[in-house]
Curated annotation (Swiss-Prot):
Domain of life: Bacteria
Gene3D superfamilies (alphabetical): 3.30.2130.30, RNA methyltransferase domain (HRMD) like, Vaccinia Virus protein VP39
UniProt-listed CDD domains: AdoMet_MTases, THUMP_AdoMetMT
Lineage: Bacteria, Pseudomonadati, Pseudomonadota, Gammaproteobacteria, Alteromonadales
Protein name (database record): Ribosomal RNA large subunit methyltransferase K/L
Annotated localization: Cytoplasm
GO cellular component: cytoplasm
C-alpha cells in the first residue's frame, strides 16, 4: 500500500473526494483545503490520473520528516532510494511548495532537494541525472507545512487540468477542472438529458468538458506524457489495461449542448478546441449576443452554465453593468424554468441582474478568488423588477443639471464640460463630458461610508448614465481620485490609449482619457485660459508647470510675442508640442523639459506675463526637494519676480482647497494682488467654489 496526495483548487476538495470515492469505492479518503489524501494501490492512482475531471496532480509519497534546519531537508530527501525510481539518464525537476522558519524561499527548498538527489547518484555512479524544466521525465515535489516536509513523486507530470485540446484561448479562460466543477455544482452533471447552454463560451471549455462527460470520455485519455512514463516502478501492462477499458466505455451521447459568443473569432477558437478534443459533433456552436440567445427548440427546462467577464478593472465595469442588467432581463424573459450557474470574481455584476441566488460556492480560478453562483429562474426570479430611473435621485439631479447647462452651452464654444460634481453626497463622483465620451471620477468615500454601499452607489451611476446622457456604456471611462497625500497629482491608471480631440474657444486639444488620472485639460480653468488669451497680445509669456501646454496654446492664439513652456515631464512637453501642431501654431515658441523650481532659480530672461499653476504637493524623484504650495509659494514667486519686467503680471493659481495666499509676503515682493478666483469659475463649476484659487499679481513699475 502507498500513500497518495491528490491536489485541486481550493474550494473543490470535497467535490474531488466524492469523485475519487466514486472512481474507487473501496478507498477511505481525507480532505484538506485543496487536497485529498488516501492510502491505496498504484492502480487506483493510475485510475485517478486517467479519469479525474477535478484533480490537478496525483502524487506518491516517498518520505517525510520534521525540519529544524535546511540540512534536514537534505537528509529527508537522501533517505529515499532514488535509483529505484529513475535512472541516471533521465531528466528531472523539483517543485517546492510552502515555507517554514528555516526554509522561507521555495527556490532554496527545491535546491536542497535537488542537491540530495544529485549527490546520491554521483556517489553511486559518478554521474548524475540532468535537471530540465521543460518536459522532465521525473517531477519531484517537496511540500512544507508547519515544519514538516513531505517529498512526493508527481505521477501526473504536467497538471491534469491541461487536457491538451486547447491550442488557443479567449480572454480570461476558465480552467478545465473548474469548468467540470461548475457542471457538477450546477446539477447538469447528474442530469445530462437536460440541455446545456453556455452563451458566453469563450474558448469553449465548459461545453467541451460537458461533451466529454456526456460521451464518458476519460479526460486524460489523449495525454501522451505522464510523470510515471519513465518511472522505474511504472506498471505499463496495468496502465494499458486501464486505457483499453476507458476506450471501451466511450458512448454516443444523447444530449443538447449549445455554446455561443458574440465574438466570431472566439467561436472559431472554440470550434478548433472542440475538434481537437474529439467532441465537435456533440456541440452546437453559434455567434450571437448573449442577450439574444434563446432556449434550444422544444426545451422548457435546462441549465445555463457560463463564465462571463469579471470586470477586474474599474474601467471595464462601465460596459459590463448595463450588459449584465440587460442579460438578466433576457434570461427572465426567455429561460423561465431553467437553472443558471455563473462564475464570477465580482459579485456586484451579478447583483445587477436583480435575481436571488439559490446557492453560492467559493473557489479559486487560478489565483483569482471566485464564486460560483446558482440561480433558479423560477417565478420569484423571473419577476421583472422596477428598473425605471424616474425615482432615482441621481438620474433626476443629472437631468436637472443637463437642462440648466444647456442654455449656458449655447453661448460657449466648447464640447468638454462638467455635468455633475458630487451634487448629492451619496453619489460621490464627478462627471465630465468630452465630446461623445464621459469620464467618471469616483472620489474616495468617507471612512464612515461602508465600501459595499459606496460601490453600490457607483454602480447605480454607471447604469443610469447611458440612459440619461445618451452615451454608449463603452464610451464611459471610470477613474478613482483619492485625496492627494504627498504625491504628484499626475498618475498612470491604465494602458488603453484612448485619444480624443476636443475644442475650446477657438483652440483644439488632444486628450488621453484613459492612461492618466487627468485627461490633459483642466476644465475648471476654461475661463482662466480665456483671460490669458485676452491679456498677452505682443507680450513675452512664460508658462510654468505647463502640463500639456493648454495655457500656452491660448497665449499663442492671443498673439503673444513669444511663449516659453516649461514642465518637468518629457511626456507633457511632447504633448504640448502636439497641441501646438494641432492648432497649426508656428513661431517663437520654446518648449523646455526641466524642474520648474530649479530652472526658475537659474533663469535670467525677462517676461511680461508669467502663468504659474503648480501642483499642491509633489515629491517627484526628479526634484531635489519636496514641494508644498502653501509652504513654498512665496519663495516660488520671489524667483518668478526676478524674471518679470516692471509692470508685468503673474497669474498664479492652484487647487489646494485650504490654500491661503500669504498677502504680506507677496506684497513685500513688490507685487500688487488682485483675487480673480470668482471671475475664473465657469458655470459648470459654480457649485464648487474652492476648485481652484486664482490671483493676478502685478509688479510695481
Amino acid at each position: 500500500m502507498f500513500e497518495f496526495l491528490v491536489t485541486t483548487s481550493k474550494g473543490l476538495d470535497e467535490l474531488l473526494a466524492q469523485e475519487i470515492t466514486k472512481l474507487c469505492p473501496q478507498l477511505s479518503v481525507k480532505t484538506k483545503p485543496g487536497q485529498v489524501l488516501f492510502t491505496g494501490e498504484i492502480e487506483q492512482a493510475y485510475k485517478i490520473c486517467l479519469w479525474s475531471r477535478l484533480a490537478n496532480r496525483v502524487m506518491l509519497k516517498l518520505a517525510d520528516g520534521h525540519v529544524d534546519s535546511a540540512d534536514d531537508v537534505y537528509q529527508i530527501t537522501s533517505s529515499v532510494n532514488w535509483t529505484s525510481h529513475f535512472s541516471v539518464n533521465s531528466t528531472f525537476v523539483v517543485d517546492f511548495v510552502g515555507a517554514s522558519h528555516c526554509i522561507n524561499n521555495s527556490q532554496f527548498g527545491a535546491l536542497k532537494i535537488k542537491d540530495a538527489v544529485v549527490d546520491q547518484f554521483n556517489e553511486l555512479f559518478e554521474s548524475r541525472p540532468s535537471v530540465s524544466k521543460i518536459e522532465p521525465d521525473i517531477r519531484i515535489q517537496g511540500r512544507m507545512w508547519s515544519d514538516k516536509l513531505t517529498v512526493y513523486l508527481d505521477l501526473s507530470g504536467s497538471s491534469l487540468h491541461q487536457r491538451h485540446y486547447r491550442t488557443k484561448t479567449g480572454l480570461a479562460p476558465v480552467k478545465e477542472h473548474i469548468a467540470c466543477a461548475m457542471l457538477v455544482r450546477s446539477g447538469w452533471a447528474n442530469d445530462q438529458q437536460a440541455p446545456l447552454v453556455d452563451p458566453m463560451c469563450g474558448a469553449g471549455t465548459i461545453a467541451i468538458e460537458a461533451a466529454l462527460m456526456a460521451a464518458n470520455i476519460a479526460p486524460a485519455l489523449k495525454r501522451e506524457r505522464w510523470g510515471f512514463t519513465r518511472w522505474l516502478q511504472h506498471d505499463a501492462t496495468l496502465w494499458q489495461s486501464l486505457l483499453d477499458d476507458a476506450n471501451a466505455q466511450i458512448i454516443t451521447p444523447n444530449c443538447v449542448i449549445s455554446a455561443s459568443d458574440i465574438d466570431h473569432g472566439v467561436v472559431s477558437i472554440a470550434k478548433e478546441n472542440a475538434d481537437a478534443a474529439g467532441v465537435f459533433s456533440g456541440i452546437k456552436f453559434n455567434t450571437i449576443d448573449a442577450c439574444k440567445v434563446i432556449p434550444p427548440k422544444g426545451h422548457t427546462k435546462g441549465y445555463i452554465v457560463s463564465n462571463p467577464p469579471y470586470g477586474e478593472r474599474l474601467s471595464e465595469i462601465t460596459a459590463l453593468l448595463p450588459l449584465f442588467q440587460a442579460w438578466g432581463t433576457s434570461l427572465k424573459e426567455h429561460f423561465k424554468g431553467w437553472n443558471l450557474s455563473l462564475l464570477t470574481s465580482n459579485r456586484d455584476l451579478l447583483r445587477s441582474m436583480k435575481m436571488f441566488a439559490h446557492k453560492e460556492y467559493k473557489l479559486m480560478n487560478g489565483k483569482l478568488e471566485c464564486q460560483l453562483v446558482n440561480f433558479a429562474l423560477d417565478e420569484k426570479n423571473c419577476i421583472t423588477r422596477e428598473t425605471s430611473l424616474s425615482n432615482n435621485d441621481f438620474a433626476n439631479r443629472l437631468n436637472k443639471n443637463i437642462k440648466r447647462l444647456s442654455k449656458w452651452l449655447k453661448s460657449e464654444n466648447t464640447n468638454c464640460y462638467r455635468i455633475y460634481d458630487a451634487d448629492l453626497p451619496e453619489y460621490n463622483v464627478a462627471i465630465d463630458r468630452y465630446g461623445d465620451w464621459l469620464v467618471v471620477q469616483e472620489y474616495a468615500a468617507p471612512k464612515n461610508v461602508p465600501e459595499a454601499k459606496a460601490k453600490r452607489r457607483l454602480h447605480e451611476v454607471i447604469v443610469a448614465l447611458p440612459q440619461v446622457v445618451d452615451v454608449p456604456a463603452e464610451q464611459i471611462v471610470m477613474k478613482v481620485r483619492a485625496q492627494q497625500k504627498g504625491k504628484s497629482q499626475y498618475e498612470k491608471v491604465s494602458q488603453k490609449q484612448k485619444m480624443l480631440e476636443v475644442f475650446e474657444n477657438g483652440a483644439k486639444f488632444k486628450l488621453n482619457l484613459t492612461d492618466y488620472l487627468d485627461t490633459g485639460l483642466f476644465l475648471d480653468h476654461r475661463v482662466t485660459r480665456q483671460l490669458v488669451q485676452q491679456r498677452v497680445k505682443d507680450k513675452d509669456v512664460l508658462n510654468l508647470f505647463a502640463y500639456t501646454g493648454s495655457v500656452s496654446v491660448h497665449a499663442a492664439l492671443g498673439k503673444a510675442k513669444s511663449v516659453t513652456t516649461v514642465d518637468m515631464s518629457n511626456t507633457y512637453v511632447d504633448w504640448a508640442k502636439e497641441n501646438f501642431a494641432l492648432n497649426k501654431l508656428k513661431g517663437p515658441y520654446e518648449f523646455i523639459q526641466a524642474d520648474c523650481l530649479t530652472w526658475l532659480e537659474r533663469h535670467n530672461n525677462q517676461y511680461d506675463f508669467i502663468f504659474i499653476d503648480p501642483p499642491s504637493f509633489s515629491n517627484s524623484k526628479r526634484m531635489d526637494t519636496t514641494w508644498d504650495v502653501q509652504r513654498d509659494h512665496v519663495a516660488l514667486l520671489r524667483n518668478a519676480v526676478k524674471c518679470l519686467r516692471p509692470g508685468g503680471e503673474i497669474m498664479f493659481s492652484n487647487n489646494l482647497r485650504q490654500f491661503k495666499l500669504d498677502e504680506e509676503g507677496v506684497s513685500q515682493l513688490g507685487l500688487t494682488i488682485q483675487d480673480i478666483t470668482q471671475k475664473t469659475l465657469p458655470e459648470d463649476f459654480k457649485r464648487n467654489p474652492k476648485i481652484h484659487g486664482c490671483w493676478v499679481l502685478t509688479l510695481n513699475a
